[in-house]
Amino acid sequence: MKKILVIVLVIGLLGSYLVPMFMKDSANTEAPFQFGFSDNLAIKYGDVVSIPAETNGEAKNVTITFGGKVIQKFAQPKEKLSIQLDSKKYQIGAYEIEMHGVDQQGQYFTEIRNVRILSDVTPEKWKLEIVRRLPHNESSFTQGLAFSGDQLYEGTGDPNQTGASLVAKVNLNTGEIGQKIGLDATRFGEGITILGDQIFQLTWLNHKCLVYNKETLELLKEFDYSTEGWGICTDGKVLFMSDGSERIYVRNPKNFDIIKTIEVYTNEFAIPRLNELEFVNGLIYANIWTSNEIAVIDPLSGKVLALIDATNLVNEGKGNGEVLNGIAYHAKSNKMYMTGKFWPTMFEVKVLK
């Protein structure tokens, strides 16, 4: 019995020392500083904003980073902090703002929040006028359209995994498929564009860009990339590629390396699901997957300058087909053509601003 009492007393004494120690350590896990907002923060491009933060008086050597770069430091911060952020120094898009520092005991802490820089442009609302209706092959799951001179090229996908993906020369006036090259059933064809004497075709999940000779359609080489492949276009110098998100990657056509990335935003939100792309008079026209809208994008900033309502095309042209997809611009005649996946009709359209 005495042994039991001694053991109980020892445990009690140890507990009287250990419990406060654990409680103290637990209390110290709370960061000595925090931002003055809990959810994502959205600011407009061009604004200079003051982001609030506060400390409990125990923080020191606090560093603020934005997009991975240091923007402000506080050696002995006050309890109320004001973090200055000039949005003009950054591209529009999503960023992380981080607060790093230590408490009086030297314990390191980090606080992270998300900040989005929105466009300062309210998109205009444009519409489409149907100028002419042309036949389109209903078996073509259109993923990309592009002109080289007067020759129309089409890239298709393969939703049934039967090896139907291809790149083909198409007769604009009849819709007939001429010379073509097919992909095996393991590869799902996506957007196409033409630069010089080469055709670039993306694949959806294979992480491959296929490069063909424009005249012979001979496969010349393949480039690797890490994302999904959706749409692609060119300004005659570089390639612009979408991956189904709000991001557009600017790529070097010689090696497919990323030159830079832009994010596509309106003055209110990001525009995800960017699909087929076409470069038209200095701007990128992008189908927005599962919608009847086409985004008109500044390729330098990612700002959406206009949203085109193509509902009239969908209502007339879809038939038993699927979504609107496919934009081709004929530069010499300044004419634009649009269609959709498995659509029986190709439309020559005029943009009404």
Describe the predicted segments one by one:
Residues 4-5, 15-44, 57:
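Short, compositionally biased P/S/T/A/G/V-rich stretches that sit at domain boundaries
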Residues 86-94:
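Surface-exposed, short loops/turns at beta-strand junctions within beta-sandwich domains
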Residues 118-139, 172-176:
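A short helix->beta-strand "capping" segment at the edge of beta-propeller domains
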Residues 129-135, 176-182, 217-223, 260-269, ...:
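A short beta-strand motif characteristic of beta-propeller blades
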Residues 131-167, 180-193:
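Beta-strand-rich domains and repeat architectures in extracellular enzymes and scaffolds
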Residues 138-149, 185-195, 225-236, 268-280, ...:
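Beta-rich, blade/repeat-based domains predominating
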Residues 153-161, 201-206, 241-246, 286-290, ...:
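Conserved beta-strand positions in repeat-built beta-propeller and related beta-rich domains
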Residues 170-175, 213-217, 253-256, 298-302, ...:
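Short loop/turn segments that connect beta-strands within beta-propeller blades
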